[in-house]
């Protein structure tokens, strides 16, 4: 099945960024807005990607 690229709910700070029609989210407490996306894994936690497109390509 297709895994969605999502933000981890417990780390979130939103910045004014929008890539490919999707909102980017950012890790709290990292200083500035370094974007990341996660691709959830059932058994291994999550893979992290710096752009929505990279995440999308890996998840689908």
Curated annotation (Swiss-Prot):
SUPFAM superfamilies listed in its UniProt record: BPTI-like
Disulphide-bridged cysteine pairs: 5-59, 15-39, 33-55
Gene Ontology MF, one: serine-type endopeptidase inhibitor activity
Domain BPTI/Kunitz inhibitor: 5-59
Xref: CDD domains: Kunitz_TAP-like
Keyword flag Disulfide bond: yes
Alphabetized UniProt keyword annotations: Disulfide bond, Protease inhibitor, Serine protease inhibitor
Superkingdom to which the source organism belongs: Eukaryota
Further comment: The inhibition of factor Xa seems to be reversible and stoichiometric.
Its biological purpose: TAP is a slow, tight-binding inhibitor of blood coagulation, specific for factor Xa.
Name under which the protein is recorded: Tick anticoagulant peptide
Species of origin: Ornithodoros moubata
Lineage: Eukaryota, Metazoa, Ecdysozoa, Arthropoda, Chelicerata
């Amino acid at each position: 099945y297709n895994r969605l690229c999502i933000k981890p709910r417990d780390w979130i700070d939103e910045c004014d960024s929008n890539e490919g029609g999707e909102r980017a989210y950012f890790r709290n407490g990292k200083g500035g807005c370094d974007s990341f996306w996660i691709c959830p894994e059932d058994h291994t936690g999550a893979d992290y990607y710096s752009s929505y497109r990279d995440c999308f390509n890996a998840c689908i």
